[in-house]
Amino acid sequence: MANVSIRKYKNSDYETVNFLFVEGTKEHLPAACWNTLKKPRFYFIIIVACASIFMCTSSYVLSLTSLVALLAVGWYGLYLEFHGYASRCQREDMLDIENSYMMSDNTCFWVAEIDRKVVGIVGAKPLKEADDELFLLHLSVARDCRQQRIGTKLCQTVIDFARQRGFKAVCLETANIQDAAIKLYEAVGFKKSLVAIPPFLLNQYTSFTVIYYRYDIKS
């Protein structure tokens, strides 16, 4: 196993950090699509739509075309959700990481390195709703460096930071499609606190849910 070191973010890390963040966000799209394809409701809509078009036109070509169009619309809708999230973060806290995370005693951003190459990232900020709880953000590990406990070390770094700063808990959110992330958080010791349905247009067909986790810090 490679020697992994965790250190605080520097401005010279920006391009690599941004790349890891965007790639980590985009890679959830296939899982979201597959999750949608497993839902009976989705197939019901497809069958009804194609059957209706065939009954009106008696055309197999138009029916198949409508099937492809519906699949394309569904994929594009999911793409817009993930792309929109990444773009929003790049306009907000990820636009200037130094200013967003490194200028306060209670916020921080870390990178994981192997042989001086940045291969993982994570950030932490206090929750706006509860200033005694720290929120873990943007955890991502390069694909070719997984299965080396890098995510675990980054999570533990945030927990240690929270403990040193006197926070009562570390909180985070993930999605039901992120199986590897869920296993990681639960292995570290995070407990599920809430499951919510995000209010985006296609969610009634995708069964996409946001899962909130909490790690209580013992005093």
From Swiss-Prot:
InterPro entries: Acyl_CoA_acyltransferase, GNAT_dom, NAT_camello-type. GO terms for biological process: gastrulation with mouth forming second; negative regulation of cell adhesion. It holds the Pfam family Acetyltransf_1. It is found in: Golgi apparatus membrane. It is an enzyme of class 2 (transferase). The keyword Transferase applies. GO terms for molecular function: N-acetyltransferase activity. Its EC number is 2.3.1.-. The chain crosses the membrane at residues 42-62, 64-84. Keywords: Acyltransferase, Developmental protein, Gastrulation, Golgi apparatus, Membrane, Transferase, Transmembrane, Transmembrane helix. Residues 62-218 form the N-acetyltransferase domain. It is a multi-pass membrane protein. PROSITE patterns: GNAT. One of its GO terms (cellular component) is Golgi membrane. At the beginning of gastrulation, expressed in deep cells of the presumptive mesoderm. At later gastrulation stages, expressed at the interface between already involuted and preinvoluted mesoderm. At late neurula and tailbud stages, expressed in the deep mass of cells lying ventrally and laterally to the closed blastopore. Gene3D superfamilies: 3.40.630.30. Plays a role in regulation of gastrulation, possibly by controlled reduction of cell adhesion which is necessary for optimal cell motility. Belongs to the camello family. PANTHER family: GNAT FAMILY N-ACETYLTRANSFERASE, N-ACETYLTRANSFERASE CAMELLO-RELATED. This is Probable N-acetyltransferase camello. It comes from Xenopus laevis.
